[in-house]
Design a protein with these regions (language model features):
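Multi-bladed beta-propeller domains
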Residues: 1-9, 35-57, 88-121, 141-173, ...
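A flexible loop/linker signature enriched in serine peptidases of the S9 family
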Residues: 4-9, 25-34, 50-55, 71-86, ...
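Residue-level detector of Asp-centered blade-edge/turn motifs that repeat once per structural unit
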Residues: 17-18, 63-64, 121-123, 177-179, ...
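Hydrophobic beta-strand positions that form the internal "hydrophobic ladder"
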Residues: 22, 68, 125-127, 182-183, ...
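Short glycine/serine/proline-enriched coil/turn segments at secondary-structure junctions
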Residues: 29, 76-79, 94, 258-259, ...
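Short, low-complexity Ser/Thr-rich regulatory SLiMs
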Residues: 63, 90, 281-285
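Serine-hydrolase catalytic core recognition
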Residues: 119, 217-222, 226-314
């Protein structure tokens, strides 16, 4: 065990093989911190790299250039409303030398801005989802060796979809870098699709049968994710991004006849304050029951989303 038993929680870590250390998030009675542990020792006290007055999440390490990125927000804000992207330069021991903060003031915006899922490319560019356009789209940030931003490409891929999830838990990922390109999942009208976002600004939709994605990670030209469809239960999805061949391993087998599974029909209706609300209607479909029951599910929270993947609990 790397750490001594104590009154704190560790999560969201990354491994720096160059320095042979684990860098991760720690929560204790004083707040949130970024800490490190040597991979060559056991039962250590944490090495404190950074301490926050607020909350931390989504570490992204570029060990080749000694750079670390993360998301930070105050305790009075929800992370999907307002947060900051922090970019730090590390020394040879893994301690922070300097940081740069990206927020609505940096981008000269009066509106609140939210960042999600910072990811480093092989070339050392930082990609992050942010909603300055009103949609969570991907922004590219190029920095110099001192960690100073030199080029920020906002709205490189202009598309009115959400390429992010509300930050309720650690470990979520909606896109990943593949060479000069980005592969990611995006939501439109409650349906998730998979696409390649090419460096030249074009977007290529990947043809496949799934409409729910989460936990996207890539290695070279292969992508893995958790996916499901309206008739296929949730499982591990793997795709070769060169020839687009894919495999799906369900977590459990579906014992229902596909003819007995109702397919959701997307529709919009007018809710309170004349706001438009999206929903899914599942028409009754069951040959064994003459009068199928009516089930209505709703969520009044700020980030609830009606999904169309197969859910056998419903």
């Amino acid at each position: 065990c790397l750490s001594k038993k104590n009154n704190y929680f560790l999560a969201g870590g990354v491994i720096d093989l160059e320095k042979n250390i684990w860098i991760g998030l720690m929560e204790d009675y004083d707040g949130d911190h970024i800490v490190s542990y040597s991979l060559e020792k056991t039962y250590q006290q944490p090495n404190f790299i950074y301490s926050s007055q607020g909350l931390l999440g989504y570490l992204a390490l570029n060990s080749n250039d000694n750079k670390l990125a993360w998301i930070e927000w105050t305790k009075t804000s929800m992370p999907w409303d307002l947060n900051e992207l922090k970019l730090a330069k590390l020394n040879e021991k893994g301690n922070i030398i300097r940081t740069v903060s990206f927020n609505n003031e940096y981008f000269k915006l009066k509106e609140k801005i939210s960042f999600f899922n910072p990811v480093w490319s092989e070339k050392g560019d930082l990609y992050v989802a942010e909603d300055s356009s009103g949609w969570w789209n991907i922004t590219q940030i190029k920095t110099d060796t001192d960690n100073k931003p030199i080029v920020i490409s906002q709205n490189k891929w202009t598309i009115q979809v959400e390429i992010a999830f509300p930050q309720w838990v650690l470990g979520m990922s909606s896109f990943s870098c593949v060479g000069d390109d980005v592969v990611g999942a995006f939501a439109k009208d409650g349906v998730w699709s998979l696409a390649l976002f090419h460096n030249n600004g074009s977007i290529q939709i990947i043809d496949q049968p799934f409409n729910e994605f989460s936990g996207l990670y890539s290695n070279q030209n292969r992508l893995v994710a958790i996916s499901s469809s309206s008739v296929i239960s949730e499982g591990i999805f793997e795709i070769d991004l060169l020839d687009k061949s894919w495999e799906h391993t369900p977590a459990s087998s579906v014992i229902l006849d596909p003819k007995e599974i109702s397919i959701g029909e997307s529709f919009w209706f007018t809710g309170s304050n004349e706001d438009k609300v999206h929903a899914w209607y599942y028409p009754p479909l069951n040959s064994q029951i003459s009068l199928p029951p009516l089930l209505v599910k709703s969520h009044s929270g700020p980030t609830g989303m009606a999904r169309c993947g197969l859910d056998l609990e419903v």
